[in-house]
């Protein structure tokens, strides 16, 4: 199994330095990862650094809380696309989901998908905060909104677990017939965990431990 082609090598910590970023990008080249996932302020640099490769530059929108307005998320997406982002990972508004404001969720996903201009849109559900029924409902809303992937986690929930096999399986079973894919992220720190997520249905893995997993 070519694990490197599942991995989006990730650096999203708020105190990430240019040195940290360059290390991530060099490792992405060394291991030929499918992509890197960086904060919006680092998209332009990452795109330039990787310009002679086929490594995707992925960024995050409304991260990590998902509580920005729809309008600001759309503007953030437009700016990230302009700066060279190949794919967008947006954070769902968990509060709106729990309040049953499903039209809001679908509308937000749809508007951000339009702003992606044909690029893949992944919707981060933040599964640590949701019940199984809420995870399934969120996946159904992602289908309605036109998303390309559903994603487990930001990795920023206090005392959160991140990606769990049972959640990845539930997400996969909910979206597979609609053609959506699953990205598992959060807590994937070794080869064993990576393989378990893939076997559960994940096509992408978001992890800061890509080099360790593939060594």
What positions do the PLM features span?
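General structural feature for long, well-ordered alpha-helical segments within catalytic domains
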Residues: 20, 24, 42, 73, ...
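Structural preference for beta-strand elements that scaffold enzyme active sites
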Residues: 6, 35, 54-58, 87-89, ...
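Catalytic cores of alpha/beta
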Residues: 47, 68-79, 130-141, 166-173, ...
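Glycine-rich phosphate-binding active-site loops on the catalytic face of alpha/beta enzymes
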Residues: 59-70, 82-97, 144-161, 186-215
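Conserved N-terminal beta1-alpha1 strand-loop-helix module at the mouth
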Residues: 1-82, 137, 141-144
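Alpha-helix-loop-beta-strand connector modules within alpha/beta enzyme cores
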Residues: 40, 44-65, 100-122, 126-129, ...
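Short beta->alpha linker loops
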Residues: 16, 38-42, 125, 188-189, ...
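Glycine/Thr-rich beta-alpha phosphate-binding loop at enzyme active sites
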Residues: 32, 37, 92-99, 127, ...
